[in-house]
Amino acid sequence: MPSSAEVGPPPLVRVDDLLSSLVMSDTRKAPSRPPRGLAATTWGPGRLDLFWVDDDRALWHSAQVAGAWTEPESLGGELASGPAVVAWAEGEMEVFAVMDDGELWNRYWDGVGWHAWESLGGELETGVTPAASSWGADRLDVFARGRDGRTWHRWWDGTRWVPWEQLG
């Protein structure tokens, strides 16, 4: 068994320092303000996926795999909110955001590559970040604030996206 000197909590990293190092490692011009809408998830041991919205309003992604960060990649879009991300099985994750049209859009990673943006509809308030959760393989829940100020919910039941329901 390792001694307590050999085992300890992972080192703490300031998020703004991490994002600065990720963005600066890219060949693009550094953003004029801190990235917004930070979200993170993990879908397996030794892996951490980080998402943010940059000055270009596109969604950006970088992954830490076995302690090393990948180069940031643009996932596109013109986000009007921060991202919400959830892993729902090993090697699978989904990211959500509200776009300028007031609809919820998503992209998902299937373990091989990113699928294109897909609209999940809705009449949502722009600028308000949705929330996402998963309580099992093939089950996703996403929550967002509607233009009516109420909370709306939509979920993936393993075969399809169930229509929006108003929660209150």
Where are these regions (language model features)?
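A structural motif
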Residues: 2-168
